[in-house]
Every structure is written in C-alpha cells, then in structure tokens.
Amino acid sequence: MNHLICWLFLIKRAAVNVKKIGQNFVLLQSFLKELLQKLQYMSNNATLEINGKSYEFPLITGTEDEVAIDIKTLRAVTGGVTTIDPGYKNTGACQSAITFLNGEEGVLRYRGYAIEDLADKANFLEVAYLLIFGELPTADELEKFHADIKEQSVVDDDVKKILDAFPKSAHPMGVLSCLTSALTAFNPSTVNVESEEEMYNATVKILGKFPVLVAWTMRKKKGLPLNYGDTSLGYVENIMKMMYEKPNEEYEQNDILLNALDKLLILHADHEQNCSTSTVRMVGSSHAGLYASLSAGISALWGPLHGGANQAVLEMLEAIREDGGDTKKYMAKAKDKSDSFRLMGFGHRVYKNFDPRAKIIKVAADEVLADLGIEDPVLDIAKGLSAEALSDPYFVDRKLYPNVDFYSGIIYRAMGIPVEMFTVMFALGRLPGWIAQWKEMRQRKEPIGRPRQIYIGENHREFKEISKR
C-alpha cells in the first residue's frame, strides 16, 4: 500500500513538473533523481506480510540477473518465523562465481565460458584449472599444474590393503568413498588448511591420487593387478592407461575413446548446487578436510536419483532387451500415465530445454560407436529409443530429450567399462568442481550449514513407567 501511495505521489509530481520543463530544468533534474532513488529502493527490497505486519528484505541480483530475497535476518526480525522448502527448489544456499546454469534456455557456463567452447577447445586439465582458480591457465601455468599433480600421484601401499579388504562384489562407489576418506589419514596436512598454498597442496594431491583410486577400483572389479600410471602421458591419457592396461600386453591408446572420455569429464566437471556439490559444501562448512568432504560428495552421488542415473539407463536398456527389444512398446509404456515404467535418461530436473551437454556428447557417442564397430543389441536399443523420442511429438512437446546420462552410459558401455563403474567415472569428472566449490566456501568463510525444520511430532507427553504402558 505504501508503495502505491509513493507511485501516485510521483505521478502527480511528474504531471506538475512536465509543465515546468521550460521554466525550470533544474527542478526536472531533481525530480528525476528523486524518482530514480525511489525506484531503486522499491526494486531492491521485497515486502513480506505476516499477521498484518510488514517486513522489508533486500533483493540480491546476480551477474546474470537472477534475483533472490535475502532472508538472513528473517527469524531475528519476525520473532522466530522461518521458511520451509523441501528439496531446496526455491532456496539459494550460497552465492557462487563458479558455474552458471539456465535450465530454461539450456545454457551452462564454467567461470563465464560456454560449455560448448570448453568441450571443443580445452582439455579436462585446463577446465579443472579454470574451475578451481577462476581463469584458464597459460601454457606455463598448465605445465606446472600438471607437474605438481604427477609428483603427488603415488598412493601409499597401505591403501592397497584397505582395497584388498573389500569383497569383489562391493559396489565401486562404496569402495571409492572409503578410499578417498582414508587418504585423510595418510595425508594429515590436508585437513586443517587455511592458506592458499595449503589449499593448493591439498588440491594437487587429490587430483594426482584420485585417478589412481578410480583405476584400482575398476581393476579390482575386473580381477586385474593394481598398477601405477605413466607420468610421461597427459592427464586423461594416463587415466585410460591405468584403467585398461593388461599384464604382458602393450597398451595402445585409442584417440577416439580418449577424446570421448576427455569430453565426458569436462561435461561432468561441475553443475552448480546439485545434491553432491551441496553435500561437499555442507560437510566442508564444518571445516572438515577436503578429502572427507569429497568422500561425502561421492556417497551423495552414489544415489540412483543423482549420479546413478547413467547406470539406471543401461539397466533399463538391458531390461528392454530381455523383453524382446521392442522399443515402440516401451515408448508407449512411457506415455501411459497408468504404467509404472519410467524412461530413464530423458528430460532433466533443471533443464527445461535440451541439455547442452547431451548435444555435445551425442556426437562423441556416434564417433565411438562408428570407430569401434560394436554389434551390441543394447546399444541398438539405445539408438532406437533416442531416434523415436526425438521424432515423437509427445516427447518433443514436453521437451523430454535424451540427457547426458543417456549418452554417457552408451559411451561407457562401448568402452567396456562395467555398469557399476559408471558413477565412479562421473565422480572422476566432478572432482575439480567439488574442489572448486569447497575452496570457494572456505575462502568466503561461509558459516556452518545448519538447516531449520518445522516440527510436526507429538507435543509434550508425560513419561509412563513400563508397567503402566
């Protein structure tokens, strides 16, 4: 109401002042200044009315014009009123300068750079540097970064004993989370870090050791002896060799597969405040060490609603194959609201348009399949589902396009990576994003995360002795 009165008053003033333009230009300038100040005040605040009382809260506008209501003082000024937002669909837990995502327009940028440009022109290690330090590296900076990582790539032999203690049937994500957490015990200097140098050392250590843990986890799953990498190779080349090298065989690099994996890792490197990233920041807000925070993020990523989606895609494709491989039948089931079947790998919670990452990785998937010439009924089913969905008005109108999980699962299948390892590969790509988010949270000295709740349980009850219950 007060704002309406202000508007009416300003409009009245405008009518009077317009008549005086020729007589008093200074008066017009003063009026315009007053108007701008009033509009600025009105646009930078939000009014919340509770039980007839109004409260003003500032609006925060991001560099991409996202607007948020700053309610840090809500409980203090209202006498204890809080908000509730299950799933945090409308809640910003932080301000971040790392990744921008516009789901409506299908836009994804790391530090201002379009994901399309990075996937086409940069390699994974360059993108990791960009995310963690904010700028693309020079040639000298990248060389030093890689050299420092290689120097820290040796994993303590006692970590092998921990790995050996797991049964072969253990899920690789559980193994990876445990091994990552164990690194804290072998690298105590990475826990209580404050300075830029300490954060850098913790960063290059985990970037060096994490690929080894990933490769060991896969080799354990396949029954292959554990190995170390080749420091003469590039970062992703070394990862490939560690995963695929076989005893008594000379390893030969496949450039098509190398390019596809490099792109996949870039596309998965960060995705702003998703479940696992928010977990890393939340755990890190208690000043837990980087590796403990990463271990928690890995566990969050393990969930089938998050990182496990690409594994779910392949399991769905296998189920369709076992049922005869009729893709049209399953497309019809997906459109039937009374059917419990869900088409995995299509649509996205955030992207209301085509997932920009999926456009990129579809090309890589086509290249991989063409190069390997694999005859695989599961991959044929995947291609059939994709083609039908992209031409079916039901899916097109609802923007249910194949997402990055759909195509990444196809590539990993073609590369011979076990289905249970898919989410581990996701974690490998997401590592630099998690590091960047943890580092940003610590450097901005964000408070410990402590969400509120609305209690809906029993009111006070009197205790009864067991004989009277």
Predicted regions located by residue number:
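Intrinsic-disorder-associated, low-complexity terminal segments enriched in Asp/Asn/His/Tyr and depleted
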Residues: 2-3, 24, 41
